[in-house]
Design a protein with these regions (language model features):
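A residue-level detector for a conserved hydrophobic packing site
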Residues: 5-6
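Conserved glycine-rich
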Residues: 94-95
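Short alpha-helical Gxxx[C/S/T] motif in the catalytic ATP-binding
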Residues: 82, 86
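Glycine-rich nucleotide-binding loop
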Residues: 41, 52, 80, 102-109
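Short beta-strand/loop element within the Bergerat-fold HATPase_c
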Residues: 23-40
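Short helix-loop "hinge" at the ATP-lid/N-box region of the Bergerat-fold HATPase_c
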Residues: 16-17
Length: 112
């Protein structure tokens, strides 16, 4: 579903532009991944530098209305819904959405 994939890309890029550290490079990559038996899927990754990673469980970033402490300023706005929509779309299409972070770098990975 092209519209759903476009919405995922838009939401992830919106999230990255809101919360990336100043002068951060936002990277988007898309690659084909073999799932065996002639089946394939796509892996979309959006990553960027952040001033600080949210403390605790990064996976909570996908919870509806959850906002990490570092993102509560009025400068960034947002309602805490976008990433939960990303995960819902991915799962509705038989995929997944995950997040990883290390050394002021955060990456969101969506597999379809």
């Amino acid at each position: 579903d092209a519209a759903a994939v476009a919405q995922v890309v838009e939401l992830l890029l919106d999230n990255a532009t809101r919360y990336a550290s100043e002068d951060s490079v936002i990277e988007l990559s898309l690659r084909a991944v073999s799932r065996g038996a002639g089946k394939g899927s796509a892996e979309l990754v959006v990553s960027n530098a952040v001033d600080e990673l949210p403390e605790g469980d990064l996976d909570r970033l996908f919870d509806r209305f959850y906002r990490a402490d570092v993102s509560r300023s009025s400068k960034t706005g947002g309602s805490g819904v976008g990433l939960s929509v990303v995960r819902a779309i991915a799962e509705a299409h038989g995929g997944s959405a995950t997040v990883s972070g290390h050394d002021h770098q955060i990456a969101f990975t969506v597999c379809f």
